[in-house]
Amino acid sequence: MNINPYFLFIDVPIQAAISTTFPYTGVPPYSHGTGTGYTIDTVIRTHEYSNKGKQYISDVTGCVMVDPTNGPLPEDNEPSAYAQLDCVLEALDRMDEEHPGLFQAGSQNAMEALMVTTVDKLTQGRQTFDWTVCRNQPAATALNTTITSFRLNDLNGADKGGLVPFCQDIIDSLDKPEMIFFTVKNIKKKLPAKNRKGFLIKRIPMKVKDRITRVEYIKRALSLNTMTKDAERGKLKRRAIATAGIQIRGFVLVVENLAKNICENLEQSGLPVGGNEKKAKLSNAVAKMLSNCPPGGISMTVTGDNTKWNECLNPRIFLAMTERITRDSPIWFRDFCSIAPVLFSNKIARLGKGFMITSKTKRLKAQIPCPDLFNIPLERYNEETRAKLKKLKPFFNEEGTASLSPGMMMGMFNMLSTVLGVAALGIKNIGNKEYLWDGLQSSDDFALFVNAKDEETCMEGINDFYRTCKLLGINMSKKKSYCNETGMFEFTSMFYRDGFVSNFAMELPSFGVAGVNESADMAIGMTIIKNNMINNGMGPATAQTAIQLFIADYRYTYKCHRGDSKVEGKRMKIIKELWENTKGRDGLLVADGGPNLYNLRNLHIPEIILKYNIMDPEYKGRLLHPQNPFVGHLSIEGIKEADITPAHGPIKKMDYDAVSGTHSWRTKRNRSILNTDQRNMILEEQCYAKCCNLFEACFNSASYRKPVGQHSMLEAMAHRLRMDARLDYESGRMSKEDFEKAMAHLGEIGYM
């Protein structure tokens, strides 16, 4: 059954019809195969924008470095990265004058936050490049392998608990003549094959110690792993994204926190706020511009698009920015903030899996790993790849990586780059001409408002803004930016026309079935519709249609049509039998073939609660029986989070209310993982989970209050248990023998 998404637009006012131009239903495109080509594209493009800069060879890594700052003055129409440092600093000076004390306060707050940040902050985050095994791992695992390897080199800062001592270790590690670390190696064993002649070669993952030289270690620490960005709609070509390693993460975190403190107090910044708060900020900006417009004058808005934002920015500009922002801070904090940009201006991009080539007879395929890209004759590649490799050659290192000193990778310094954009917007006017500009910036997206007495002066203002941005390394695209009278523009996928236009078509892909389990999917579906009514101006008739479409989709997904429907099938047989034997058929869940009772008034109520009072007692008993092996009470208590994928922008986390019943099952993890080197990771995770459960059993508040202190977990638990035992013994809740037994056990642990 194909559902026509246009049903959703029945009661939409005419200007909101923008929604109909986004018929994004269905699965977005995912990337397949190797991402090497996209990464090489990024490396080549980035260097092309900076190619007139100073070139030199790094004395540490031997890589080719390019520094475009203070390069030739930029030209119109060509994107370039030649930011002029004195212009950047002057723009920041003006920002400092306009917001007195903002830089000092932001630095002070960031410094105080850094002092109390613990190492475990680095466990937040998804994939992280792990230098010990040279591939991506979950952030927590990468941090763990780094800390255990650091201990082998007498670097024990992490044990103190704070982020600062751990970061000090990272700096010290870069000076060690060699680094010893644990890695995973596959040992091949020959075993006689059971069912045929000959041998089987079995790979056994082993944890082994290894050592690398200082230069090799520094190269790994500076490496960014690259992948292809998935699920991007509206583009023919995929593009590369990067993942930094643990050494860079801690320093980036502090710089981003500093920039966040500043963005929060800049009225032109679209970060770090979101949703309705961002809309309020936008509406205020529009109102302010219209009220400042000269009598009889004109106010224009440019919906802006920047060409290759990341590739034209430069870490050296960010270094200048952190130095300027932290000007009045203690020297240690200024040094700390300067490390991230310095590491980034020496970064090295890993190129991924390499290319596939076929033999001349087209019979055999072979994967050429990145270190060997230039070891085979170039004519073996197709023309496109050959052209790429020729351009890549000067920046290629023999390990199969590429030197990438200019440019930033996606999503690394969103806040700090926003500060740079806002600095350009804050200049407002050049040479006291008769226009004023202002605007909004959110990472690489911007909207520019210009007020002047007539259209020509407005255009002059826009051109001046364009050239101002050029001096900061920002390239506004003349082709993709367009200008309207103020009152109609788009900023971060929010469309404005005398107020925000309801734009729930963006959310259409997330109106489907989430695929967690029957119980959660129903809750998520209804919550999304509810949220769209609250936040995105979805009207009642539309919402009603959305409910019906969702229920249809849900029934098709889980093959659970109404008990009185004519649909056949294995599951329907069981459902029909249940339907026949049930008195209160309204009480059956939709997943059990019951009717849908959802309407606009009860979207916020979980289905089990909605139908609780009209269920047959025996059905209710089966559905909610705590001893029923399918009722996952422990795993589903209270509020749960789901990942929602809108058509635009990142995956969002969304809370929904969960009530556990027999439909709240959890799928088992894929068993095939048990024979890989990931197995150790799972065992470690289970070990951590047990430790944390033990700790929470001793300290009930640990689940909602972060424990602070310098004790190890073991000492803290032993101490707490001794206290509890003594209290129980003294109050008579515990016998003398039990008390002595408990004390003896605690003594055996070695902490008495």
UniProtKB/Swiss-Prot annotation:
Enzymatic class: transferase
Span of the annotated motif Nuclear localization signal: 187-195, 203-216
GO process annotations (BP): DNA-templated transcription; symbiont-mediated suppression of host gene expression; symbiont-mediated suppression of host mRNA transcription via inhibition of RNA polymerase II activity; viral RNA genome replication; viral transcription
GO cellular component annotations of the record: host cell cytoplasm; host cell nucleus
Organism expressing this protein natively: Influenza B virus (strain B/Lee/1940)
UniProt-listed HAMAP family: INFV_RDRP
Catalytic activity field: RNA(n) + a ribonucleoside 5'-triphosphate = RNA(n+1) + diphosphate
Location(s), subcellular: Host nucleus; Host cytoplasm
Protein name from the UniProt record: RNA-directed RNA polymerase catalytic subunit
Gene coding for it: PB1
Domain RdRp catalytic, first and last residues per copy: 286-482
Similarity section: Belongs to the influenza viruses polymerase PB1 family.
GO function terms (MF aspect): nucleotide binding; RNA binding; RNA-directed RNA polymerase activity
EC numbers on record: 2.7.7.48
Ranges where the record places region Promoter-binding site: 249-256
A Pfam family per the record: Flu_PB1
Post-translational modification: Phosphorylated by host PRKCA.
InterPro entries: RNA-dir_pol_NSvirus, RNA_pol_PB1_influenza
